[in-house]
């Protein structure tokens, strides 16, 4: 009996290891979850654009960010999910319809890209405090400031609006896990945290998994704070999202009670990756939010 259990345990271990290797090969190499500075510059130079790529230190962390566009215009800050990096947003950062309206910023969140890959920081409030420096210290960002968060980036965008209400003028939340427990937990999520396995985990997945393990706890901390959000919010999600429960829309409606407006847009037949396969729709929502916030600041709304 003991020998049988041992064989089963060994098979599970080997299966998990093979799965991690396959995921790393597919996600880490086939899909560009991070681009180095040279690759990013080449991407934008090919489009006749000159990005600014910078690094800064905060709370003992080095953080990379990218800025493109006219800094005298309004501001959009993009916050990626997990696993990912600021290169996730390159199609948006080079979108002329957004650049006509705003200066565009994106960051590698702590633990991703070139902000300490594999060294995760699950604390959402701390992440928000680190990312806000892009807007109020490194650059004197022009208002209105719209923050766009996708997946795990959405709670961080929301926390920015909660903790720094004078900084954020509008939120666009894409496939957002907002309610504690309203997201998919994989069968291997907690197993991967075992030290016997964790050292084998690819760095980007180590960060994503650590955030996943602590996400419910972090979102629970935010439960009393949603009433702090007074800015307009656009919420977008695929109705067939298999990673983040569509019931998060109901959570948003129940908790964003003081948002000046809440526009929930559920997209039929679409899953979690709407930032990729519904880019025009998402970019359109960002333009709408910018226009709405600009009218409000001009006193026309």
Predicted ranges, named:
Residues 71-114:
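Conserved HGGG/HGGXW glycine-rich cap/lid loop of the alpha/beta-hydrolase fold
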């Amino acid at each position: 009996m003991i020998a049988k259990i041992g064989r089963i345990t060994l098979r599970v271990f080997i299966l998990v290891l093979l799965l991690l290797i396959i995921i790393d090969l597919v996600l880490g190499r086939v899909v560009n979850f991070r681009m180095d500075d040279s690759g990013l510059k080449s991407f934008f130079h090919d489009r006749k654009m000159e990005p600014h790529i910078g690094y800064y230190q905060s709370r003992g962390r080095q953080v990379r960010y990218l800025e493109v566009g006219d800094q005298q215009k309004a501001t959009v800050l993009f916050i990626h999910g997990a696993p990912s990096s600021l290169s996730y947003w390159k199609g948006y950062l080079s979108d002329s319809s957004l650049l006509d309206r705003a200066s565009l910023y994106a960051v590698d969140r702590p633990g991703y890209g070139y902000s300490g890959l594999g060294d995760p920081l699950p604390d959402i409030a701390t992440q928000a405090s680190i990312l806000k420096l892009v807007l109020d210290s490194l650059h004197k960002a022009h208002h209105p400031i719209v923050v766009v968060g996708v997946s795990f980036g959405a709670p961080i965008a929301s926390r920015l609006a909660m903790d720094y209400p004078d900084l954020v003028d509008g939120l666009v939340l894409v496939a957002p896990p907002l309610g504690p427990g309203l997201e998919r937990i994989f069968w291997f999520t907690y197993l991967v945290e075992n030290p016997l396995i964790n050292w084998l985990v690819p760095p980007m997945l180590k960060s994503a998994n650590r955030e996943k393990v602590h996400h419910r706890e972090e979102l629970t901390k935010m439960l009393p704070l949603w009433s702090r959000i007074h800015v307009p919010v656009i919420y977008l999600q695929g109705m067939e999202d298999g990673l983040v429960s569509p019931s998060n829309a109901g959570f948003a409606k129940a908790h964003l009670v003081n948002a000046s407006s809440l526009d929930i847009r559920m997209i039929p037949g679409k899953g979690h990756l709407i930032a990729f396969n519904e880019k025009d729709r998402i970019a359109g929502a960002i333009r709408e939010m910018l226009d709405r916030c600009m009218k409000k600041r001009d006193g026309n709304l």
